[in-house]
């Protein structure tokens, strides 16, 4: 099920977020955790890609466990700051093969002491969103920042980048954490 179908209802949705284990870990315990969490009947479960891509190898495998074993809509995170375009294309192909249609496309944290972007990397999440959209019928989400992205000089600049994400194919947005509801309400009225 596409997340936009869930999010376009008046119902309150509760979701769970999974952090895959580090590379080389055994997945049996994590698959049991997925089953235990699925028994709670969340509207969907998201699976992170890992800070700087460190746990990215298991994202698709756990999202597959969520969707195809436990029959809960899965939202696979995909970050591009620490991945080449070839790696991203490979992940997108895996998602298609496993019929995981919901993707949260993020730039992610830039690895420390790294030249970024390299010629074979995406600079912005909007570029990643465009490529995901061009490679399949995915339901793509993106991040938004009610208090402004730390790298944006102004909130207006941040809203320009937000529009670029939507224009590239982003269908829903999720906020970073905020502590003042008025800031979020003002942000959504400006957006």
Predicted regions and their residues:
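Active-site-adjacent beta->alpha loops and helix N-cap segments on the catalytic face
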Residues: 54-63, 85-87, 112-129, 179-186
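Hydrophobic faces of well-ordered beta-strands that scaffold small-molecule active sites
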Residues: 14-16, 45-47, 74-78, 105, ...
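Alpha/beta enzyme core
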Residues: 27-44, 92-103, 122-139, 149-168
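Conserved small/polar residues in nucleotide/adenosyl-binding loops
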Residues: 187-191
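Glycine-rich, positively charged N-terminal anion/phosphate-binding segment
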Residues: 3-4, 27-35, 52-72
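N-terminal amphipathic alpha-helix/helix-capping segment at the start of soluble metabolic enzymes
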Residues: 1-16
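Glycine- and other small-residue-rich loops at beta-strand/loop junctions that grip anionic moieties
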Residues: 48, 55, 77-80, 121, ...
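Active-site mouth loops of central-metabolism enzymes
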Residues: 16-28, 75-86, 143-156
């Amino acid at each position: 099920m596409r997340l936009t179908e869930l999010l376009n209802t008046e119902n309150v949705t509760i979701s769970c977020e999974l952090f895959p284990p580090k590379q080389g870990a055994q997945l049996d315990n994590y698959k049991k955790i997925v089953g235990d969490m699925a028994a709670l009947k969340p509207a969907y479960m998201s699976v992170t890609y890992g800070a700087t891509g460190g746990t990215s190898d298991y994202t698709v495998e756990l999202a597959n466990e969520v969707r195809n074993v436990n029959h809960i809509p899965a939202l696979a995170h995909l970050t591009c700051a620490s991945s080449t375009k070839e790696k991203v294309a490979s992940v997108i192909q895996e998602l298609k093969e496993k019929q995981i249609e919901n993707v949260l496309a993020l730039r992610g944290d830039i690895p420390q002491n790294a030249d970024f972007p390299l010629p074979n990397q995406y600079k912005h999440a909007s570029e990643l969103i465009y490529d995901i959209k061009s490679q399949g019928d995915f339901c793509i989400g993106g991040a938004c920042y009610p208090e402004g992205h730390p790298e944006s000089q102004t909130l207006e600049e941040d809203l320009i980048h937000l529009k670029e994400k939507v224009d590239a194919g982003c269908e829903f947005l999720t906020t970073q954490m905020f502590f003042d509801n008025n800031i979020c309400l003002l942000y959504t009225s400006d957006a």
